[in-house]
Every structure is written in C-alpha cells, then in structure tokens.
Amino acid sequence: MSKIIGIDLGTTNSCVAVLDGGQVKIIENAEGARTTPSIVAYMDDGETLVGAPAKRQAVTNPKNTLYAVKRLIGRKFDEKAVQKDIDLMPYSIVKADNGDAWVEVHGKKLAPPQVSAEVLRKMKKTAEDYLGEEVTEAVITVPAYFNDSQRQATKDAGRIAGLEVKRIINEPTAAALAFGLDKTEKGDRKIVVYDLGGGTFDVSIIEIADVDGEMQFEVLSTNGDTFLGGEDFDQRIIDYIISEFKKEQGVDLSKDVLALQRLKEAAEKAKIELSSSQQTEINLPYITADASGPKHLNLKITRAKLEALVEELIERTIEPCRVAIKDAGVKVSDIDDVILVGGMTRMPKVQDKVKEFFGREPRKDVNPDEAVAAGAAIQGSVLSGERKDVLLLDVTPLSLGIETLGGVMTKMIQKNTTIPTRYSQTFSTADDNQPAVTIKVFQGEREIAAGNKGLGEFNLEGIPPAPRGLPQIEVTFDIDANGILHVSAKDKGTGKENKITIKANSGLSEDEIQRMVKDAEANAEEDHRLAELAQARNQADALVHATRKSLTEYGEKLEAAEKESIEAAIKDLEDILKTGDKAEIDAKVEALSTASQKLGEKMYADMQAQQQAQQQQAADNAKPVDDNVVDADFKEVKRDQ
C-alpha cells in the first residue's frame, strides 16, 4: 500500500513529510532544502518554475511570478482583504466569471487552486523521489480559521495536482500531533498552538489525553485571522523604506514594479536578520534612476524600529487568543504548554507578547517550519492504518446556519463543534401556497445573515399548496471530517426527500477541475519535454567541447577535407542548439559523431602508439644495468674436520 504523505501548503513556504519506519521524515526537495517557497513563475517560453528557481528570477519577472496565492484561495474578488492585496501585489488579480479572485499571467486567467496545484505537484514529486514509488494520496493542512470555500478550494488544488486528498486537517491541530506524540509526560495536558505564518494566523486550544493507551487530541476551540501573517510584516517594512527613500531622494518607488520586487526581497531578509541581530542594513544599488542619474538605496533598520512598525500587527493576534480561551471554557492558568508554529514566531517581540499573555515561556523544542507537515504525515499514517494509537477530534471554526425571515442568521451548527457532525432542524413556509423555498447557507458569527460568508443556496421545489407555516421542511447540515459541508432538505408532509448538495456560488465546477487536471497533466508532459531538451543540449554542448579539444590536439593528422567536415558539423550543431528541438539536436549530434570518426581513429592510433612506446620503455628499463659481469665457475671445497 502506498504511503499517504503530509503536506503543509503554506502561504510563503511549503513542506512535505512522510512516516517512514515509524519516524516522521521531513523530505528535502531537489534543491536540498526542507522547505520550498510557495512561489510559481510562468516563463515566456512556456516553462513553469516552482520554489527556489521561481523565487530567484522574481526580480526580473514580477508580473508573472505568483506568491502568497493562498491568501486568495476560496475568496471573492470584491472582499475588502482582496482589494487591499490588489494594490500591493506586482501581479494582476482579476475577477472571475463566478466572482472569485483569480490571477492573470501572460493574458491567461488562472484560479488560485490551479497555482497552488503547481506547488503541490512539486511536493508530490519530492516525496516520490524520496520513496521511489508513485504517491497518489495526501493529507493537506489549512489554517484552522479557513471557511468552507477555502477548504473546498484547497481540496480542488490537490485534485488538480493528481492527489486524492484523504483529509484536510487544521494547521494548529497538525502541530499539536507532532508535539504530542514526541512527549513522554503522562496525564492530560492542555496546550495552546499559536500559529503565525506567512499569510494567516491561528490559535487553537487542544487537550491531549491518554485514553486506554490511545493518544486523544481534542480541539477545544480555535480562532484566528486568515489575512494576517509575515507578508503583512514585510509590507510594513516596504512602506517604511519607500517613505524614507521619498524623503531622502524625492522619488516614489511604490509605482516601480521592479523596484518593489527588490524591496520585497530586502524586507524579508531584513526581518529575518533582525530576529538574531539588533541592526541590519538594506543596501540596494541602482534601485531606480531619474534625470540626474541612478539612485542607490542605503538604509539602516534597528530591531526597535521594526518592532515599532509591526507592534499593531502583533497586538492583533492577542484578541483571537482571548476569544479561544473563553470559547474553550478554560483559564490561562490551565494551559500546560504554549507551542509556537510558523516562521513569524521566531521574532523575539512575538515571543515576548505570547509569554506576556499566557504567563509562561513558549516551548522552543518544536520546529516552527516543519511541525505542521510532520503532523499531517502522522494523520496520514493514522488514515492508512499504519498507526492505530492516535485519535483526533477537530472542530469547525465558524458557525453554520441559514437565512430565515427578516434576513436573520439561524445557526444550525455552532462554532467549535467537534466534527464530523450532523444536525437537522425543521422549517416552514413564509407565505400561503408557497410552492418552493430557497435555502441560503451562511458561515460566520454575525446575527444578520448578510454580514456572514454566503456558501451557497438551493431551492426545494414542489411543495403542495398549504397555508403558511404548515409545510414542514427538514434541513440537515452534515460536516465531514475535512470540515466541508453538505446540506440536504426533505418535505416531511409528502415524505418526498430531495438530497441537495449546495450549488456553490463560488469555487470551481467539476468541469473546470477536470480541465485544470488535464492542463496540469499536459504541463507535466511539457516539463518532461523541456527536461529532455535541456539534457540533449547539455550532451551536445559537451560533445562540441570535446571534439574541439581533440581537433586542436590531433587536427594536423587529418586530411584537410576531413577537418573541414568536422568543423562544418560542429557549426551545424551549434546553430541548432539554441532553437532546435530534441530530435533536431539528436540528428546533428549523430552527424558530428559520424564526421568525427576519423578523428577518433587517429586519436586511438596515437594513444596505442604512445602506450606501446611506454611499454617498450618499461621493458628496456627492466634490463640489468651492468653487461660486463662475468659468470664464474665455482667448486665446493670440503674441509677436513
């Protein structure tokens, strides 16, 4: 049975792990790194770069290099948070036909799940290279505060990447799994997972209990902000640099896409450096130019300055912590451990704030970049039956309900309800002889339905004529273990049951997913073709170099016509190298190999002659040095005793 891998699909970085020989193994990618930047670049020649190669060329290709796409997944274009990102991102965010936020590259519209699928494909390939077998199943993590649309979109991304997503698991819960299974402490423990990543923030209160030798992880509550993370911290630094440069040089860098990409890189680097040093210098020569000539950027930033810039962002993480503690029905003093997850938790000011709120030092024995993927791999091993000593009880992060008379949100399933769960409630008609009802499903905590996230709507038709309030329509909400919602309705009067799944007012249709799966497969073929082409070019290049070298050494031993023939074949191969396809290059390589045959024979003959000369020399050296030695006869003389 093939392994179920665990993937942490992050806003900034992604990570893949697997349970191998009973131990969690974080798998290194082709570049030798344990995490992969969640960056996808679409090149002019049709090639798609993912991870570090995409990040390296971002400065020169800002419009076609997509990063932090997770912030758009499952979101509407008109949402306030998306509108804010439109002004900040160098790439183009556009409105899809269904109202979702998509991106545009080379004039082609792409859905965020399609872009995320490229990252997942790299994670899949990384795992396959390590395991030496095909991988088709995965557990993928999402922020605990992701809503239904965002979870559905993440699942779609997995399908487009050629993965069957066995489970969508919340990131803090995954980190708790990775932490809890390592620990030898006995007895029940309540832990807090504070997860501040590249684009999202989550906090979960989790109880770890030993129930008859089985480790039970029960999520008591969760809260967060899906638009708060390291990207926002970077933006504060970028804004500061722009304002300082404008003061100093009178030039506004915010309109210069190339400069912005360089600033983003520098801001991220400065932020990381200031976690371990008190001061850093941002040095960007030739950042821009005006009539007076090129301008250089040189700016010192202290840790204190950075902390002042981001203080309000760190403060914003505390309110969700307060709400999570209250919802879990525990006191801060009941918490046994505080676990920090996500790269941003390396910032000393963040650690201080967490310590101040929870009144205890956060644990330092959990790797903030790898814990989530490790937990996902553990959950994968539970689902495959490899591990049987772990039980995970997660919750739905937001309340679910329907819109009833007067636009009120009637909650069917309260937030922090353990999943999977099912709940039914009976509703009726608002008018006499009403033939149908429209059921609108929402997710959120507001009292008025319109203030919450609309997940979809459906009609129940064919209700027999009756006075209002008489028909009985039973609505059932069913949340699966992935936190994804299914809704059905039944007319109790007629006994007629309609199984109705929400017709999502956003997200990808089945046809779109299938088309994207085909696109991804075609891409894989294209990637394979490009890899083969690169290999053919490298081999051809090596042959040209070796032939030239041999021609220099042995060329004078050839006939003039033979030499010309080889030189012509070299030129033909060089001409085709940059523009030709694999078949054309292979043909010219074959032609050069044939033309060089005589040269090879001459080289071989020369080497043979050299070898024979060396052997002769060695044989001569082995002869005795003195030829004048005379052999003497001797006779044994026996002495008388």
UniProtKB/Swiss-Prot annotation:
- Phosphothreonine occurs at 200
Task: Indicate the transmembrane segments per the record.
Answer: none
Q: Where does the record place Low complexity bias?
A: 608-619
Family annotation (Gene3D superfamilies): 1.20.1270.10, 3.30.420.40, Actin, Chain A, domain 4, Substrate Binding Domain Of DNAk, Chain A, domain 1
Q: Which domain of life is it from?
A: Bacteria
SUPFAM superfamilies assigned: Actin-like ATPase domain, Heat shock protein 70kD (HSP70), C-terminal subdomain, Heat shock protein 70kD (HSP70), peptide-binding domain
Q: Which GO terms describe its molecular function?
A: ATP binding; ATP-dependent protein folding chaperone; unfolded protein binding
CDD domains tied to this protein:
ASKHA_NBD_HSP70_DnaK-like (cd10234)
Cross-referenced Pfam families, in alphabetical order? HSP70
Q: Which PANTHER family match?
A: HEAT SHOCK PROTEIN 70KDA
What name does UniProt use for this protein? Chaperone protein DnaK
